[in-house]
Each structure stands twice: as structure tokens, then as C-alpha cells.
Amino acid sequence: EASYFYNFDTYEVLPDDFKITINYESNPLTELFQKITMLLSISFIATSSSINGRQLKGIINGQRTMEYCCDINNIQDNKVLYRIYNWIYTDGSPIDKAIIARNVISLHCKYVSITEIDDKVMASIQSNYNLYLKDNVKDYLELKNKVAEFISDIVSKTGEYATSLLDKFKSNL
């Protein structure tokens, strides 16, 4: 719902499926699993993406629209991309988190490739999200106060109406 991976019907996997801890060095699958984890992380961070042959292509719609194309064979591991993916899809609203992450990434990747994202980008994403939450809490508290005031007014009017009705019954007896 937060991203569209065109090849998902062919590759029904998530980055988490390849995030496996391998306990010994020189395991031939380590590099392959890291590469797959990274490619899928990029795919699920993006607004839309697809794998065509040996290329991963995608679009990130944020503050600016950014298109990227990565050669699958030459891609280097970047653990920050998985951390961003994991942050988006763990807890909270993935749509809100994806929008914030894409805004920051689209601005940052004006100067570097998406595969070169670093910890500063992740920190910026989290900082922007915290500001977003702070604004939402403020809006929530304002709305809660308005609802409480509305309920208080309704209860008061209901009490006045009940008293008026009781007085009319007394006068009719």
C-alpha cells in the first residue's frame, strides 16, 4: 500500500526474507543475500520500482521526483537502506513514514546515488517524523478539547431540556 513493486507477482519476497544472520565467515551466500536485501529495500522504499534484466529502475516521488537505475551486478551493500525500509514498515503508519522518507531521500539524492545513502539521511528522516508526530499530537489535543467542549454543551443542554420538561409536567398536574 505504501509502495508498488511491479515484479512482486514474480518475486513474492520481502527484504526481511533475506536478512539472515550467517554465523561463519566466507559463506558464499552472505554477499548474495546482502545484495538481494538491499535491492528489495530500495524497491519498497520507492514509490514504484521494477527489475528489468540486470537493472533495478524506480521512481521516488517526494519534495522532488527522482528516477534511479541501478545495475544489479555492480551494486554495493548499504545497510542504511534496509534500516530505512524496516523503519517504514515497522510500527505506525507506513504511508506517512514512506512519504516522509521519500521527501528526505529525494532531496538528498539530488547530489548522490540512492545506493550511497548514509546514516545522516536516516537521522534526518527520523527527525522529520518526530516533528510530524509533534504536530499531530498538538492537533489531536486541540480536537480532543473541542470534542470535550461539545459533549459538555450537549450534556448541559440535555439537562436544561430535562428540567424544562419536568417543570411542564409539574404544571400540568
What residue ranges belong to the model's regions?
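A broad "ordered helical/assembly scaffold" signature
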Residues: 101-104, 113-129, 154, 160-162
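Transmembrane alpha-helical segments and their cytosolic interface motifs
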Residues: 143-173
